[in-house]
């Protein structure tokens, strides 16, 4: 195995990635090498990750519940705060039960473990998150990939699987992280019911944003708690029986130490803001509409997103890199996505509560300076 040759190959394809050292964030600004940039990369959509905490409340919490129980939840790491949080969160979202994980990635790995060694086939959207793909793969499950958001294609696959002994499982992101498109939850529920399937929805980029009404007919909802929640961790909503099965078969839960207690404190505080701070969602929705108005003028042929995730699809790595560099030079930090994350090079722009219309104006003013040519698809 030639490691240097592999790295050289990645570099030659223009796909080489590096970790960017970040100093700090403050509202809509991010600090890199002592320079400030408007931050259009954060998943902290509601700005809850930067709320001010009461130091004494935090210290009282740690004094009561310790810093870290230093064990897995199935041994001695199952803090009573887990139960309190799981009950409060599942009641707010009207689910029978909930289970907190160390990350949304871990939650998806655990979910698919419950189907291992069973006669099932998974029907997965073409653009589902990598954690879903890995969960299916690591559990050794049969799968069918349907075209992105093409529910006629999904139904044609479901209709061809007629063996009553095979359990069908449909899985989809609610909001897709790379392009901001939204799943049709009502259509997925209809197909689940028609074909007697289990339905799993990953709500990592929608939980807390009120983009969907959660249906009682969704069997399992998974989510990160590090996006709109501004905390750290993951969660699964399900029936009590499914939760118990995950506890007994979910390897990423069984073999991981529990979250430090202070993380549970931040989840607790975030829940309060998710429930009470409706003004955060209202401002974010207004910013999204303002962004889309300018986006339509500059990119009339590119699809709109009514979520906080916006993207610009480029026709080459070179044009994407040039646009990314130009924005960075003008003090604007966006996400640059490339293969294998996306099939075409893409600049992703994430809006947050902290942005204002001046930030969006500045972004588009810089993009208008760029010689479009054949730069965009």
Residues covered by each model-derived region:
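PLP-dependent enzyme catalytic core of the Aspartate aminotransferase-like
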Residues: 51-52, 56, 60, 64, ...
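Conserved N-terminal alpha-helix of the aminotransferase class I/II PLP-enzyme fold
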Residues: 56-103
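Conserved PLP-anchoring active-site segment centered on the Schiff-base-forming lysine
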Residues: 111-130, 151, 155
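Active-site phosphate-binding strand-loop segment of PLP-dependent enzymes
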Residues: 144, 148-201
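Active-site PLP attachment segment
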Residues: 214-245
């Amino acid at each position: 195995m030639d490691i240097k040759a592999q790295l050289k190959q990645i570099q030659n394809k223009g796909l080489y990635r590096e970790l960017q050292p970040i100093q700090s964030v403050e509202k809509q600004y991010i600090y890199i090498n002592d320079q400030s940039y408007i931050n259009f990369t954060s998943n902290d959509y509601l700005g809850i990750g930067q709320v001010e905490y009461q130091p004494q409340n935090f210290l009282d919490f740690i004094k009561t519940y310790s810093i870290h129980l230093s064990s897995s939840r199935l041994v001695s790491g199952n803090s009573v705060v887990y139960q309190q949080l799981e009950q409060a969160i599942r009641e707010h979202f009207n689910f029978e039960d909930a289970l907190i994980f160390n990350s949304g990635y871990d939650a998806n790995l655990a979910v698919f473990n419950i189907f291992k060694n069973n006669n099932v086939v998974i029907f997965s959207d073409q653009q589902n998150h990598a954690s879903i793909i890995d969960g299916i793969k690591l559990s050794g499950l049969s799968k069918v990939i349907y075209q992105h958001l093409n529910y006629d294609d999904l139904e044609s696959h479901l209709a061809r699987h007629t063996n009553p002994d095979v359990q069908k499982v449909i899985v989809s992101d609610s909001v897709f992280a790379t392009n901001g498109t939204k799943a049709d939850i009502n259509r997925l529920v209809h197909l689940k019911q028609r074909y007697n399937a289990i339905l799993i929805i990953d709500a990592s980029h929608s939980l807390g944003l009120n983009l969907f009404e959660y249906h009682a007919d969704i069997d399992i909802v998974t989510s990160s708690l590090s996006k709109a929640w501004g905390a750290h961790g993951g969660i699964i909503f399900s029936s009590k029986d499914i939760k118990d099965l995950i506890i007994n078969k979910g390897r990423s839960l069984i073999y991981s130490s529990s979250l430090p207690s202070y993380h549970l404190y931040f989840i607790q505080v975030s829940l309060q803001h998710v429930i009470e701070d409706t003004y955060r969602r209202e401002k974010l929705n207004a910013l999204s509409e303002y962004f889309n108005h300018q986006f339509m003028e500059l990119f009339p042929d590119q699809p709109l997103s009514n979520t906080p995730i916006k993207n610009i699809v480029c026709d080459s790595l070179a044009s994407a890199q040039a646009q990314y560099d130009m924005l960075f030079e003008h003090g604007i930090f966006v996400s640059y996505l490339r293969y294998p994350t996306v099939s075409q090079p893409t600049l992703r722009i994430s809006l947050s509560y902290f942005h204002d219309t001046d930030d969006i104006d500045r972004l588009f003013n810089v993009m208008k300076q760029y010689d479009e040519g054949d730069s965009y698809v």
